[in-house]
Amino acid sequence: MKWILFLLSFALMSVLNMAAQGRVQGSFAPLKGESRVNFDMVFMNIHGMSEADFSTYETDWQKDKPEVVGIFTNGVNRKLGNSLSVGHFPDAPYTLKVMVNSVSTKGDYLCDALLLDAQQHEIARIDALKTRGGVWGTKLNLIKQGAESAGKACGKALKAALKKAGK
């Protein structure tokens, strides 16, 4: 009986881990030899509202958003290590654009990561990165906790895509 519970637990953890990794389309090979990538983050839906509506509802959002983006990029960079740095590098030839499709009231994120060239054409993408948010706290605290786990998941998926591409 214990053996069956162990196998079921292992299978569940494997499925959850695969769900967080997303699907890779295209190749991240153009990032070979690059040390820096510009970063952009767009929030499509927060707590069932557009970002503009959420800004009206949560008046501090425009002040807090840079911190949330910083938490996300720190998570990405921690997973990437020294191989590549993601941040505000407008002169970099490539941009990693994260489209946050939704942030739930618990801080769960669903996002896509797109690699764009200098002309903003899509080269590659990682679709459907799903992560869990926070456990307790204010709405902003849950969004920040979710940004940290989403950043780590994005960094992990990006690192795997780079490894597959040979970087």
Model segments located where?
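Surface-exposed short loop/turn segments
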Residues: 22-23, 79-144
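C-terminal/domain-edge helix-coil "capping" segments
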Residues: 21-34, 122-167
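Bacterial Sec-dependent N-terminal signal peptides
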Residues: 1-24
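A structural "domain/chain start" motif
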Residues: 19-70, 160-167
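Negatively charged, low-complexity tracts enriched in Asp/Glu with abundant Ser/Thr
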Residues: 39-41, 70, 74-86
